[in-house]
Amino acid sequence: MITWDQTGSYEVSEIAGGGSADGDDWMTVLLQTKAFHRIPPANLQALFMRMQHVACRAGEVVIKQGDDGDFFYVITKGAAVVTRETPMNRDGLKLAELGVGESFGEEALISDGKRNATITMQTDGALVRLGKDDFKELLNEPLLHWVELPRARELIERGAKWLDVRLPSEFETFHLDDALNVPLYFIRLKVKTLDTKTPYIAVCDTGRRSSAAAFLLSERGFDAYCLQGGMAGNQLGPD
């Protein structure tokens, strides 16, 4: 069962499937993040109940760039590396290393797009995974905050910043004043350069990529929002 303790943190006990204390380390890491404090205990209970356990070998490709999204993953044992193939680097540009308690696979599920990177196990290990529909119901909806343009502008006036997650070529064609450009596939690599005290409003053309970016930031404890309708839906573009 998952409950709140007196300090405002989650306590975990008697999760279906059991396991050793060491085996639950990944669960503890997840529940200690600020983002998971926004998720109702009932959602978390259902989330852990519906997750499937998967064993992996070193060198195994869990997610391949260009494939359709089907699952959200959390590492429960071992480590993985995130790479992205580019025209200039066919072997893959290293974007991040992931360890126990860290997750991946969110972007394609939220944006309904293709996988934008490849995830390969660096060691033997284990994962838990959650199907797309369960992910959207239990995790995506509680963590994703949409804002209309008037509200977004109010937040900007109070110190929030636009985070444009389109490609640099799109950004150069047109962008909002003072917007910061961090393409979606670079979010994991660049997240440490962002100010954790600054609210960010993610934007893209339609809202698909920016919703994935806002979710990733929320997972990491940022105060993140996504512009409803994207730039196109709000007629924000070159004159």
Predicted regions and their residues:
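Short secondary-structure transition/capping segments
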Residues: L194, G237-D239
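Helix-loop module immediately N-terminal to the HCX5R catalytic loop
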Residues: D178-I201
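Cytosolic regulatory regions built on CNB/CRP/Popeye-like sensor folds
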Residues: M1-T173, I187-R188, R209-A232, D239
